[in-house]
Regions:
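Conserved short loop/turn motifs at secondary-structure junctions
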Residues: 1, 110-111, 188-193, 268-277, ...
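Intrinsically disordered, low-complexity regulatory segments
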Residues: 1-169, 173-175, 473
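Basic, low-complexity terminal or inter-domain segments flanking catalytic cores
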Residues: 2, 81, 88, 125, ...
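Amphipathic alpha-helical transducer elements in NTP-driven molecular machines
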Residues: 9-16, 33-36, 40, 59-62, ...
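Accessory interaction regions appended to the cores of large information-processing enzymes
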Residues: 17-23, 47-48, 54-55, 154, ...
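C-terminal or mid-to-C-terminal helical accessory/interaction module adjacent to the motor/catalytic core
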Residues: 87, 100, 142-225, 268-269
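Metal- or metallocofactor-binding catalytic centers and their adjacent structured scaffolds
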Residues: 243-279, 285
């Protein structure tokens, strides 16, 4: 008898149907010489410190560096304790009996790093010695399963992948346990969570938030000159910015008096915008968040459901390319979309056409190729599932369509010695951009079309306006932008090729990034504000402590991810990686243990409005660190305790938004904004009323 183990029951049922196993037993399906069984994700994992005889959080226990990791069944909370999950223990017993009876085991867990680890941990925990082979497939269609079973590989072919997965698991344990315990000991209270990937990700959110909220916008002016040629009117913006209306107004007057503008440069060129690459998981999550506001976790769950419904190929992929043999199947896949209400016409137009090969590269396909549809006709999908399916299908049509051809014109003009500029864009052939029919937004110095212009052309000045603008901070992170930052280990990369090159050294992997974000939400370190990600006071407090430590360094953590990739490819030894992680974790624990307990709950980042120094937030007050200034602002105003965010707004922007819940003397409450008076004391601001000073009274206990 052969035993096939899948990652979850639903996949086991599909495999059983293909091989003709139909007799349902407790925990497996039997028939035709097979027993098809399943895990429920990670049934087994590294044990907590208590398994090594280490109780509680004690300074002398750190760092905790097990020589050999103990594995134990998944635990669930029961009262105040964690106990082995009864369902997990039962299924492990079933697996043990099946493995002992089997001639060979076929591993059919997800074909990736975590799927490999799920099986290997079970195999190791059970002390099993039955030989095993690997089923490695990229979709769950009947054909893919049959072909995969005809081409199973020896399990040993994936030993390096397992070593990489185990190294990742152990590294997360070593860093997470030691850092979290060290911080809890230093703080002297509460439970704190730090992690190898979650902490630098939190740092990215906090850095952007503090940069955004402390930004002081600057107003500037640009001249907008109106002119025309051959009945085609257009406008050009001054290249210079002006910071006073007097200066800008004087120049505007001069321009109007001059009456004509001269072309000093007119260059036209044709460009071909290549179609976008196919989706990997992170790219899909980013676009789904930008387009529909879907969270990374929701998108992952949705594509997993589409995969199990045989509608798309393996979703947890990190590649945006396909190999040549898959490209050969593209005409049939595109033909399956001919009746699609949105993409049918475009898919039909590609029949017999020369398909773009930009996304075809055998060398850039690792474990799995980019996401594609399978050609199966979708049944009943939820509206949200349909949107995600259409994104994958639409991207497939885009990726193999012709380039978008544009004529780009760059024009420089001069009037009274003042330079102006305008850019024109005309789409000659929409190519792949026809698929979604989305219009590109024009930049402020861009026109949809320009008349033919030549050097030394003289045009009339038909008008000139002052356009008032403000400098803007970089926006708060959304899940989309944070996923991009994680992929690039915190670097701002716009170029697609540069992003591809950074993939192996990002924070986490495509399969784990959504879980990292959800961990930050569940720990209450970050929250959603519409689509923006905002750190909580707790998250800012943690960041304030670790921001200058290696554990918050995105690039350093990205380097560890690159090392894990090298272990998987056989280019690095797992033992060397483990020793490096142990040194790293020991350094982090030592640094955290040196943190002064009194600062463990502080939040810094606001600047002092009086001297420009650093302000530190305590439980009851905010104080300037500058010994000569020592500005103090009490947190409680009219029995209302201000949050860290409100204090930061008051100190950095000089005014808060409207705050509810201030106490009246007669027992009622009122709402008002707060500003600072000339002596830097909080003052109420009421709409249509004059400011009045606060009492700064403490909240009644």
């Amino acid at each position: 008898m052969k035993v096939i183990i899948a990652e979850k029951p639903s996949v086991a049922q599909q495999i059983a149907a293909v091989i003709g196993a139909s007799v349902r037993r407790d925990g497996y399906i039997e028939g035709n010489g097979y027993a098809v069984t399943w895990a429920f994700g990670h049934l087994v994992g590294p044990a907590m410190p208590e398994a090594y005889g280490i109780e509680g959080f004690r300074r002398e226990n750190l760092p905790i560096l097990p020589e050999t990791f103990i594995l134990e069944p998944r635990k669930v909370k029961s009262g105040k304790e964690y106990k082995p999950d009864p369902g997990t223990v039962k299924q492990l017993g079933i697996l043990h009996k099946l493995f002992d009876k089997a001639e060979r085991i076929v591993v059919a867990t997800d074909a990736g790093r975590e799927g490999e680890l799920i099986f290997r941990f079970i195999y190791q925990y059970l002390g099993c010695h039955t030989p095993f082979d690997r089923l490695w497939i990229s979709s769950l269609t009947d054909k893919a399963i049959r072909d995969g079973l005809q081409n199973i590989r020896p399990g040993s072919d994936y030993d390096n992948l397992y070593r990489s997965a185990r190294a990742r698991s152990e590294a997360d344990w070593i860093v997470g346990i030691n850092a979290s315990q060290a911080l809890a000991i230093a703080a002297g209270r509460g439970v704190w969570s730090l992690g190898r990937v979650q902490t630098p990700t939190l740092a990215l959110v906090c850095q952007r938030y503090l940069e955004n909220t402390s930004f002081t916008p600057q107003t500037y002016l640009r001249l907008k000159l109106h002119t025309a040629k051959d009945a085609t009117a257009f406008a050009a913006l001054s290249t210079e910015r002006y910071y006073t209306k007097e200066e800008a107004g004087g120049i505007l007057k001069t321009v109007m008096e001059t009456g004509c503008v001269r072309v000093t440069k007119a260059e036209s060129r044709q460009i071909k915008e290549q179609p976008p690459l196919l989706y990997d998981l992170t790219a899909l999550q980013k676009d789904a968040n930008t387009r529909y506001g879907f969270s990374a976790e929701w998108t992952l769950d949705t594509v997993q459901a589409l995969y199990e419904a045989k509608l798309i190929t393996y979703p947890r992929t990190g590649s945006r390319y396909i190999p040549q043999d898959v490209f050969d199947e593209l005409p049939a896949l595109l033909a399956s979309l001919r009746e699609h209400p949105a993409f049918g016409t475009h898919a039909a137009a590609l029949a017999g056409a020369q398909l773009c090969r930009r996304a075809v590269d055998n060398e850039k396909v690792t474990d799995h190729h980019a996401m594609l549809i399978t050609g199966h006709t979708p049944g009943k999908l939820t509206p949200e599932q349909e949107k995600v399916y259409d994104m994958i299908a639409g991207r497939m049509v885009e990726a193999f369509s012709a380039p978008c051809v544009k004529d780009i014109t760059a024009v420089r003009l001069e009037c009274a010695g003042i330079p102006f500029e305008v850019h024109g864009t005309v789409v000659e052939s929409a190519g792949w951009r026809k698929v979604w029919c989305e219009k590109e937004e024009l930049h402020e110095d861009e026109a949809a079309a320009l008349p033919p212009l030549a050097y030394e052309d003289t045009l009339p000045v038909r008008g000139c306006d002052l356009v008032e603008k403000q400098t803007r901070p970089r926006p708060l992170h959304t899940e989309s932008s944070l996923l991009a930052a994680m992929e690039a280990a915190g670097k701002e990369l716009e170029d697609e090729a540069e992003r591809e090159a950074m993939k192996d050294s990002g924070l986490g992997t495509p399969a784990t990034r959504a879980a990292v974000l959800e961990t930050l939400f569940s720990r209450e370190y970050i929250r959603r504000d519409k689509r923006a990600l905002v750190p909580t006071e707790k998250g800012l407090a943690v960041y304030g402590i670790v921001k200058n430590m290696p554990i918050a360094d995105a690039a350093l953590t990205g380097g560890w991810e690159l090392a894990l990739s090298k272990i998987a490819s056989g280019d690095m030894d797992a033992f060397t990686f483990r020793k490096g992680i142990e040194v790293y974790a020991s350094q982090i624990a030592n640094e955290l243990l040196k943190v002064r307990i009194e600062t463990a709950g502080e939040h810094t980042g606001a600047k002092c409005p009086r001297c420009g120094g650093q302000v530190v937030f305590f439980q009851k007050v905010a104080k300037c660190r500058n010994a000569e200034c020592r500005l103090t602002v009490f947190r409680t105003v009219a029995q209302k305790e201000l949050t860290d965010v409100q204090l930061a707004e008051l100190l950095t922007k000089g005014r808060t938004g409207t705050i509810k819940g201030f106490a009246k003397s007669d027992g009622g409450t009122f709402e008002a904004a707060l500003t600072l008076d000339g002596e830097f004391r909080p003052t109420f601001v009421f709409e249509n009323r004059k400011p009045g000073k606060t009492t700064g009274r403490k909240t009644r206990k």
